[in-house]
UniProtKB/Swiss-Prot annotation:
Name this protein carries in UniProt: Dihydroxy-acid dehydratase
NCBIfam families, A to Z: ilvD, PRK00911.1
Ligand binding (Mg(2+)): D80, D122, K123, E447
Cellular component, GO, one term: cytosol
Note on cofactor: Binds 1 [2Fe-2S] cluster per subunit. This cluster acts as a Lewis acid cofactor.
A GO term, aspect molecular function: magnesium ion binding
Length: 560
């Protein structure tokens, strides 16, 4: 065992003395058992994580019952909703790398034999996965579970995005401040990851398709008693995975990545999942090109539409309809789409995991013969504005905006864009351009939920598009194109756009372009001053110097 490095032999007496002092060692027999890290992300700032302390306790009990010795440790976490719309959002994506580094550090420093990872929200799940793949010790994931949707006294179903969009409605006088307060107080009714197919729930669902989590991980509600049982079952599996030396890199493959992307496309997951899955592939040293997503999308039907793409369906409805296993079972009917032989942490193949699954509500999970669309709910757009690609959540775009041409309204930061939208500078037909908000320019590639919600709230969702080198919340909806690469800070073409330039977005054609010739773009970029970093000290200054492009997952470079 790896942990023998810190516990075996007379020369390790000091190490054993320290281990005994933790209280985790009951008898000397424990030194012959595998040491299992319980990587928890409990904190009291994130509603999706406020309940994880109890799940950690359940996991530790299950590991002991299975014959292991558990050691719980924590990672940090950022609530994207609370960090939204101010300087705090610059730390959100950057926190993913801190989490990956912290997992690597604890596992390697203490020679742990295996890991039970308990994440829940946006950057925590991919961060833990990146760290686990880096160390390549046996691992199993079990999330904290989704929040239930809220309900107003009038019976209207609401979620966090309802609150964000209500701010825009209040600014136009469509609703009163009292009505806004009602939505505010009902939008997030309890613990759990926010209740739509936003980034957190998307990633926790993808864990099932990747093979790293038990069925139910992505959809069983946080407050459902079955969540505690799932934690117990998952933690109970880790000792067997350690004993059989089942490592994450033996589970993650190109095939399992394609399975996860197919699921993502079929349920219209967050655009952030592309960013995170590319980063996960990078840690596993798997080659996956941005452009492959369009090829996969062409044969993946969009069969499960969940908030924010609709206000009628939330994650709890997906769970009731059969969960992720039912979606995968339906997708397995498309010849050659899924690799059902992919291994998983259950000890069975993906095909075996979903063999008994069935769709229990066709209003939530459609058949592949009658999808919402024949192609997936995400797409990569290329063109002279995004030579290296950009991403759009097609499933959340209204039919009238699938093709759009309009004049650019350019803002060099998100705050200016929000002000422009709220004060009426943005008009019907415009294409809002928010730049210098990419991985390096932001820094941290902040999410644009506030401006997209303002656009929707002010009734412009069917007439205004938004493009950015930043990214979007999983809760964003509308004609929102993000991850534009190269970013403005790297002198990408988006830096050449001026207010009034005509921009065409053609989602079915997978293109996005500005009506400028190459020479004009080149001349405008040459005339620009060198990019001046916004933050010059602390973690974000270091992050900005090391981060790579969005089209490769915005991972940190190790080439110096």
């Amino acid at each position: 065992m790896r942990s023998d490095t810190i516990k075996k032999g007379f020369e390790k007496a000091p190490h054993r003395s320290l281990l005994k002092a933790t209280g985790a060692i009951s008898t000397r027999d424990d030194y012959s058992k595998p040491f299992i890290g319980i990587c928890n992300s409990f904190n009291e700032l994130i509603p999706g994580h406020a309940h994880l302390q109890e799940l950690g306790r359940i996991a530790k009990e299950a590991v002991r019952e299975a014959g292991g010795v558990p050691f719980e440790f924590n990672t940090i976490g950022v609530c994207d909703g609370i960090a939204m719309g101010h300087v705090g959002m610059r730390y959100s994506l950057a926190s993913r790398e801190l989490i990956a580094d912290s997992v690597e550090t604890v596992v390697e420093a203490h020679r742990l034999d295996g890991l039970v990872c308990i994440p829940n929200c946006d950057k925590i799940t991919p961060g833990m996965m990146m760290g686990a793949l880096r160390t390549n010790v046996p691992v199993i994931f079990v999330s904290g579970g989704p929040m239930s949707a809220g309900h107003t006294p009038s019976g209207k179903t609401v979620d966090l995005i309802s609150v964000f969009e209500a701010v825009g409605q209040c600014s136009t006088g469509e609703i009163t401040e009292d009505e806004l307060q009602t939505i505010e107080e009902c939008g997030c009714p309890g613990c759990g990851s926010c209740s739509g197919m936003f980034t957190a729930n998307s990633m926790n669902c993808l864990c099932e398709a990747l093979g790293f989590a038990l069925p139910g991980n992505g959809t069983i509600l946080a407050a459902d008693p079955r969540r505690n049982e799932l934690v117990k079952a998952a933690a109970g599996r880790i000792v067997d995975l350690v004993n059989k030396d089942v490592r994450p890199r033996s589970i993650l493959s190109r095939q399992s990545m394609l399975n996860a992307f197919a699921l993502d496309l079929a349920m219209g997951g967050s655009t952030n999942t592309i960013l995170h899955t590319l980063a996960i592939a990078s840690e596993a040293e798997l080659e996956f090109d941005f452009s492959e997503l369009n090829d996969l999308s062409a044969k993946t039907p969009y069969i499960c539409k969940v908030s924010p793409a609709t206000t009628e369906v939330h994650i709890e409805d997906v769970d009731r309809a059969g969960g992720i296993s039912a979606i995968l079972k339906e997708l397995s009917k498309v010849e050659g789409l899924l690799d059902l032989s992919a291994p998983t942490v259950t000890g069975k193949t993906l095909g075996e995991n979903i063999a008994d699954a069935e769709v229990l509500d066709r209003s939530v999970i459609r058949s592949v013969e009658e999808p919402y669309s024949a192609t997936g709910g995400l797409a990569v757009l290329y063109g002279n504005l995004a030579p290296n690609g950009s991403v759009v959540k097609t499933g959340a775009v209204s039919p009238s905006m699938m093709k759009h041409t309009g004049p650019a309204k350019v803002y060099d930061c998100q705050d200016d864009a929000i002000a422009g939208i709220m004060n009426g500078d943005v008009k019907s037909g415009d294409v809002v351009v928010i730049r210098y908000e990419g991985p390096r320019g932001g820094p941290g590639m902040p999410e644009m939920l506030s401006p997209t919600s303002a656009i929707m709230g002010r009734g412009l969702g069917d007439s205004v598009a938004l493009i950015t080198d930043g990214r979007f919340s999983g809760g964003s909806r509308g004609a929102c194109v993000g991850h534009v690469s190269p970013e403005a800070a790297d002198r990408g073409p988006i830096a050449a756009v001026q207010t009034g330039d005509m921009i065409t977005i053609d989602i079915p054609g997978r293109t996005m372009s500005v009506a400028l010739d190459d020479e004009t773009i080149r001349q405008r970029i040459e005339a620009l001053p060198e990019f001046e970093p916004k933050i010059k000290k602390g973690y974000l200054a270091r992050y900005a110097r090391m981060v790579t492009s969005a089209n490769t997952g915005a991972v940190l470079t190790t080439n110096f």
